[in-house]
Amino acid sequence: MSGGLDCLALKEDDVQKFLASGAHIGSSNLDYQMTQYVYKRKPDGTYIINLRRTWEKLLMAARIIVAIENPADVCVISSRPYGQRAVLKFGAHTGATPIAGRYTPGTFTNQIQAAFREPRILIVTDPRSDHQPVTEASYVNIPVIALCNTDSPLRYVDIAIPCNNKSIHSIGLMWWMLSREVLRLRGAISRDVTWEIMCDLYFFRDPEEAEKEEQEARDRATAVKEEPAQPYAEQWSDPVAVPPAGQPVAEVTDWAADSVKAPVAGIGTYGGPSEDWAVADAPAAPAAPTPAAPSQEFTATDDWGGAASNDWAISS
């Protein structure tokens, strides 16, 4: 398919991308029409796709897309979530019309609905999951290009690009290579220069993981922000010097310079406040002894209610 041209030959860098994304790994089932694209079968029953045939079909599909004058007449569809980001990026870079998500039945056949389209060529991610647009394309004679696995049905498929259409990285890489080859054939980018768009842009990203990464980035940015320096007083009794508005606060670089030593309290008995911290506290005067209370002597009497008396006739 490359016609012996070195510029169209499969490069080693592209082969490494194919192997890293797992584009050569098929499924454990094999459709009889996909037998020609199988290289060998692994001991565990998984089929290996011939990457040379994948590259040839990729070039053929790119040449067909470039032959269409209006890029908007190319319709790319992916109902599976793994290929929706890829078809949207493909449409943004090549000018094709993407349909990501649920396909509305009758888009190609029902002329009275608002979503009616008449594309000149249709490209689908999986002919099994996108069977509705493939079937409708056969009704109105629209050629179909599909990314096909070893077990994909080829009914109504005109050009099958053999690859792994189940892997996230494989789907993104195939759409990225197809868009790169289309732009090269149009002359938009040079073959001697590496395309500035990375294939990671075509990979599917989970919205929850993307939101988590954005939240972590915001948290890191918040932690990096430094708080502004606040004015301080050297003594507790000194007023705080507040700089005027608009003037930056001087930053303290050496906290050990001109530091004020705090007074150290004595170990002895506290003798009251002193104006001069350098003067030692005077020893406290000894306390005077407390006088003892006078002792009282009591005389035993027979009369418990009054004083002692010898005359019993006298009332107390």
UniProtKB/Swiss-Prot annotation:
SUPFAM superfamilies: Ribosomal protein S2. Gene3D superfamilies: Glucose-6-phosphate isomerase like protein, domain 1 (3.40.50.10490). Residues 209-240, 283-316 are annotated as: Disordered. GO terms for biological process: ribosomal small subunit assembly; translation. Keywords: Cytoplasm, Ribonucleoprotein, Ribosomal protein. It holds the Pfam family Ribosomal_S2. GO terms for molecular function: structural constituent of ribosome. It is found in: Cytoplasm. Component of the small ribosomal subunit. Mature ribosomes consist of a small (40S) and a large (60S) subunit. The 40S subunit contains about 33 different proteins and 1 molecule of RNA (18S). The 60S subunit contains about 49 different proteins and 3 molecules of RNA (28S, 5.8S and 5S). Interacts with ribosomal protein S21. Belongs to the universal ribosomal protein uS2 family. It comes from the Eukaryota. One of its GO terms (cellular component) is cytosolic small ribosomal subunit. Required for the assembly and/or stability of the 40S ribosomal subunit. Required for the processing of the 20S rRNA-precursor to mature 18S rRNA in a late step of the maturation of 40S ribosomal subunits. NCBIfam families: uS2_euk_arch. It comes from Tripneustes gratilla. The keyword Cytoplasm applies. Disulfide bonds: none annotated. This is Small ribosomal subunit protein uS2. Its main location: cytoplasm. PANTHER family: 40S RIBOSOMAL PROTEIN SA. Residues 215-228 have a biased composition (Basic and acidic residues).
